[in-house]
Amino acid sequence: MSAETGSRAPHIPVLLEEVVAALDPKPGDLIVDATFGAGGYTRRLLDAGATVHAFDRDPDAIAAGKLWGETCGKEPRLVLHPRRFSEIAEGLAEAGIAGVQGVVFDIGVSSMQLDQAARGFAFSSDGPLDMRMSQEGPSAADFLNEADEGEIADVLYRYGEERQSRRIARAIVAARPLTTTAQFAAVVRKALGYRPDIKGPKAPKDPATRSFQAVRIHVNGELDELVQGLAAAEKVLVPGGRIAVVSFHSLEDRIVKQFLREGAGAVPAGSRHLPQLESKVQAVFEKPSGAIRPTPEEEARNPRARSATLRCAVRTAAPARAHQGRAAA
């Protein structure tokens, strides 16, 4: 999956070798692919002899997975769950499974979704302003046409880290109604004075990228979903089980990093002016690995890998923590 919204490329799993090495799948292992998408990780895990429980809230991904499973000869070891990854525990319980040896997440929008103009995730091709991963609930157009200026600005700032969020929000309200991705992108570009005619290495990044990311995250509740999905993974991993999370922007990576660090027993630093209290936190993960980034060769081969970060950890035998289930504001 990828944070990029303006490029086209065939689906190539990001950090595939590194993810497989982190999960270390063995024949007979049960592994959750929490973000099935086009099945890139799942195929390699099946090749290693594991049974994969694949989750995806996108009905198109599940339909494609069923068709592939029927033709690849590995269908008995591929179990598809048309669910959000926050529902991993419930899906496994329905299948009679109490624990798994591995969980992998590939956070964000998938290459398949980006490359289908009708899904409305990208501005490289004009399409309806949709952006819903599950194809249910309010669309991006619903939000942009109905929310007030302040709410739109807050979403652009919080989820797109857009410093000019208020200027863009004013332009959106003035241009409503918006119905297509091209309209939305054009409004953002005009508001910020973006010049697409400037080419070459010094050309500025299309500012519509940040706004598309922000609206997509909001429409799909992606950060809250990530927090809940990580907590679900902690719950279903057996002692010695492994978690691998690939993220594509700083908002996601901060959540993953904090989750794994606190899971390994790290506690937020207190004030130097107050007495230090002894930590009683029981580590549910071994000390996580540092961030793993794509090699220059992979970035050249797959441009969508450029912003990817992989973080991994191993589950201990400690009981799972109680989680609030929402991303920090």
Swiss-Prot record:
The cross-references to Pfam families, in alphabetical order and at most eight, read:
Methyltransf_5 (PF01795)
Which positions are annotated as binding S-adenosyl-L-methionine?
Answer: G39, G40, Y41, D56, F85, D106, Q113
Methyltransferase recorded as keyword: yes
Query: What are the BP-aspect GO terms?
Result: rRNA base methylation
The encoding gene: rsmH
If you read the UniProt record, what top EC class would you report for this enzyme, in one word? transferase
Q: Which family does it belong to?
A: Belongs to the methyltransferase superfamily. RsmH family.
Q: Which HAMAP family match?
A: 16SrRNA_methyltr_H
State the taxonomy lineage.
Bacteria, Pseudomonadati, Pseudomonadota, Alphaproteobacteria, Sphingomonadales
Native species = Novosphingobium aromaticivorans (strain ATCC 700278 / DSM 12444 / CCUG 56034 / CIP 105152 / NBRC 16084 / F199)
Task: State where the protein is found.
Answer: Cytoplasm
Q: Name one GO cellular component term.
A: cytoplasm
Q: What EC designation does it have?
A: 2.1.1.199
The cross-references to InterPro entries, in alphabetical order and at most eight, read: RsmH, SAM-dep_MeTrfase_MraW_recog, SAM-dependent_MTases_sf
Q: Which SUPFAM superfamilies match?
A: Putative methyltransferase TM0872, insert domain, S-adenosyl-L-methionine-dependent methyltransferases
Q: Where is this region: Disordered?
A: 289-308
Name assigned to this protein: Ribosomal RNA small subunit methyltransferase H
Gene Ontology molecular function, alphabetical: rRNA (cytosine-N4-)-methyltransferase activity
Q: Which UniProt keywords apply?
A: Cytoplasm, Methyltransferase, rRNA processing, S-adenosyl-L-methionine, Transferase
* Chemical reaction(s) catalysed: cytidine(1402) in 16S rRNA + S-adenosyl-L-methionine = N(4)-methylcytidine(1402) in 16S rRNA + S-adenosyl-L-homocysteine + H(+)
Q: Main role? A: Specifically methylates the N4 position of cytidine in position 1402 (C1402) of 16S rRNA.
